[in-house]
Structure formats: C-alpha cells, structure tokens
C-alpha cells in the first residue's frame, strides 16, 4: 500500500472521529461552502420566552402553598406555591427565606430565577412586596 493511501485513510478517520466528538452546549457543526450553497444560510428556531415572558417581574395571585422535596443529593422541605400570573399562566414559585405568611388569594410579586434542586420551579417570590412579608429577624 502506498503512503498516499495511508495518509488519506488517516485523514478520513481523523475527520470522522472529530465529527463524532462531543461539542459544548449551544454549538453546531460548521457547514462547508458547498452545503451553504446548496441549502442557503442556516435557519435557527426562534428562542422560547421564559416563564416571565421577557419581563423582570410579574404580579400574581397565590392559588395554594405546598412543600416540595429537592433532587437527590439534597434533603429538605422547600416551601413553594402555585401562582396565577397576571399574564394568565399558572406557575410554581419558590418562597425563599425562613418562614412565610402566604395563604390562598394573597397577591405576590414574582421574579425569574430557578431553584437548582427543584425540577420545574423557575420563579421566585419577592419577599417584602405586596402580601408577602419580609424574612423575620432571628431572636
């Protein structure tokens, strides 16, 4: 077998191996000029809005309060509430701090920011605004 055949096989295996290599999140493989010519410029899907739909905070009404258990390595009882937002959507919100006075029909201010160990909880209640009191000072 000739050297050129070996080199061609080596370069093809390297290219094939690089194509299968894991890529960091959010990156796409680059298109060749021929692919760009045939397909046109890449069309990316529009990004989905977050739970607050691009707003920093939203007002909402508490539907019910409950306790959730966090994911595997952590153990606690995380206080959460189901809130009907001013946009009409319902969402689960985390209540930060120790102790709270929230009950059904209380009006709260909600901001984005997920709770890492609670799956599906992407909003937090703002303490000290509307019907949600400040965190009490320890005695």
Swiss-Prot record:
Keywords: Mitochondrion, Ribonucleoprotein, Ribosomal protein, Transit peptide. GO terms for molecular function: structural constituent of ribosome. SUPFAM superfamilies: Nucleic acid-binding proteins. The keyword Signal does not apply. Residues 1-29 form a transit peptide. PROSITE patterns: RIBOSOMAL_S12 (PS00055). NCBIfam families: rpsL_bact. Belongs to the universal ribosomal protein uS12 family. This is Small ribosomal subunit protein uS12m. It comes from Bos taurus (Bovine).
């Amino acid at each position: 077998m000739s050297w050129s055949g070996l080199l061609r096989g080596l370069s093809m295996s390297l290219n094939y191996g690089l194509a299968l290599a894991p890529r960091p999140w959010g990156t796409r493989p680059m298109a060749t000029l021929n692919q760009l010519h045939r397909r046109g410029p890449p069309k990316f899907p529009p990004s989905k809005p977050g739970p607050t739909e691009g707003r920093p905070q939203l007002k909402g009404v508490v539907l019910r309060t409950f306790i959730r258990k966090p994911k595997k390595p952590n153990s606690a009882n995380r206080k959460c509430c189901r809130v009907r937002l001013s946009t009409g959507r319902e969402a689960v919100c985390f209540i930060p701090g120790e102790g709270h006075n929230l009950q059904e029909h209380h009006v709260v201010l909600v901001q984005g920011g997920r709770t890492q160990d609670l799956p599906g909880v992407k909003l937090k209640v703002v303490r000290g605004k509307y019907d949600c009191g400040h965190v009490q000072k320890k005695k």
